Amino acid sequence: MDLTIVIVSFKSGDILHRCIKSIDKRYPILVIENSIDNKLKIDLEEKYQNVDCILPKENLGYGGGNNLGLSRVKTNYALILNPDVILKKDSIENFFKSANKNPEFGIIAPVSLNEKYTNFNHDKDIDVKEVENVKGFAMFFNMKNLEKSNFFDENFFLYLEEMDLCKRVLSLIH
C-alpha cells in the first residue's frame, strides 16, 4: 500500500484508539504524541502492529507535529487525520479513486459528515473540485507536490496552518 497515515495527538486517549481502529490495518500509522506520554506510546505500539508512536522532545503543535510525521513518510501518499476522525470503510479507497482521476493533485480532503458543523455541505456524492483551502481534520497528500511546499509553516502553532499550506500547494501546481 502506497500510503502512510499521520495523526498528531495531545492526550487523545480513547478518541485516538477509535480513530486507529477505523483505519485498515494494512496502512502504517505514525502517531505524533505531543504530550510526550511514554505510557501511551507503549500502549499504542503493543495494541497495533501498524502504529509507530513518536514522542517529540516538546509539544510541536499541529503543524510541527505533522511536519515531523510527514518528514518520515516514504510512500507516495500521506493522509493526516485529527485523532477524533473516524473513517468510513471506503474512505481510503475513495481518496485513491480521486487521486487516480487527478494525478497532479496537491491535497484532497473529504467533506465532513458531522451534522453539527452546519457550514459544511453534507451531500455525500460531491465530485472532486478545486478549492482554495480545506479543513485540516483529514488531508490526503501527493507527497511529490507537498515536499515542494516545505510542509506546514511552524510559525502557525495550532490554527490557520492548513489554509497557509493550501495556498502554497495550490500556487505550486498551477
Regions found by a protein language model. Name each.
Residues A78:
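Short aromatic/hydrophobic "clamp" motif used to bind/position activated sugar donors
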